[in-house]
């Protein structure tokens, strides 16, 4: 999305990750998209930020070491958090569960998810917001550290550092219930796709296409001769 006219009147605005949080926030500010998002948020539209989008939603962005743009700037001020960019980069797989959320986000409370973090900077909390989730680093299926706070929720805005947050079936269903309730629709009115199942179906189609276009008997013969 590049123009204010493309925004329309959505039920949920999702600000995704970015490699340059401060630079992209300046761009949103210059072309009027930030003002439009803030206007819709004031009218009750849900706003969710992931990673860099989460950082944008906070009160301030500080870059003392010049990791991105240098200096400091005001955030969108929808979440009571501050972000300070640091040279060290966080890269880790995580799993967790959303906390006891409030207002329009209540239906996401207590939902399990998996994903990963990859970002610069640390975010700290001001009083007033709710911790969005508790997460732990994972290796395979094992937690390797204690659960820690991640993300924030305040009124109709929320944010998280976790990429892939809505890939799980549980989170997809919870978000669907939330949006249906907000619009006064029965859950049955909207269909959803299990992304993991969909991916497996596409892999099966690809494998079948390869089998049809290749001499599988010859391939198996070569494999057997190589193992002999």
What do the PLM-derived regions correspond to, one by one?
Residues 11-12:
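Short, Asp-centered acidic motifs that coordinate Mg2+ and/or phosphate
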Residues 19-104, 109-114:
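Cysteine-nucleophile active-site neighborhood
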Residues 54, 83, 120-122, 164-166:
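Glycine-rich beta-alpha junction loops
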Residues 26, 35, 48, 55, ...:
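Feature representing long, continuous alpha-helical segments
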Residues 148-228:
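Acyltransferase
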Residues 99-155:
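Catalytic beta-strand/loop cores that center a nucleophilic Ser/Cys/Thr
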Residues 16, 115-119, 158-162:
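Active-site-proximal beta-strand elements of phosphoester/diester hydrolases
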């Amino acid at each position: 999305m590049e123009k204010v006219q493309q925004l329309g009147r959505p039920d949920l605005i999702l600000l995704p990750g970015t490699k340059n949080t401060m630079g992209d926030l300046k761009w949103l500010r210059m072309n009027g998209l930030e003002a439009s998002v803030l206007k819709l948020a004031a009218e009750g539209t849900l706003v969710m930020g992931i990673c860099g989008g989460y950082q944008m939603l906070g009160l301030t962005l500080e870059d003392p070491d010049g990791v991105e743009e240098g200096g400091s700037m005001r955030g969108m001020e929808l979440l009571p958090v501050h972000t300070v960019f640091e040279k060290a980069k966080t890269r880790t797989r995580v799993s967790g569960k959303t906390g006891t959320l409030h207002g329009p986000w209540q239906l996401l409370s207590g939902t399990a998810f998996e994903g990963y973090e990859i970002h610069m900077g640390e975010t700290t909390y001001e009083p007033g917001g709710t911790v969005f989730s508790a997460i732990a680093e994972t290796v395979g299926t094992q937690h390797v550290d204690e659960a820690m706070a991640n993300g924030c929720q305040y009124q109709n805005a929320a944010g998280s550092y976790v990429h892939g947050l809505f890939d799980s079936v549980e989170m997809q269903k919870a978000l669907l219930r939330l949006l249906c309730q907000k619009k006064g629709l029965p859950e049955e009115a909207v269909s959803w796709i299990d992304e993991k199942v969909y991916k497996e179906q596409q892999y099966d189609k690809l494998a079948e296409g390869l089998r049809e276009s290749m001499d599988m008997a010859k391939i198996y013969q070569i494999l057997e001769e190589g193992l002999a």
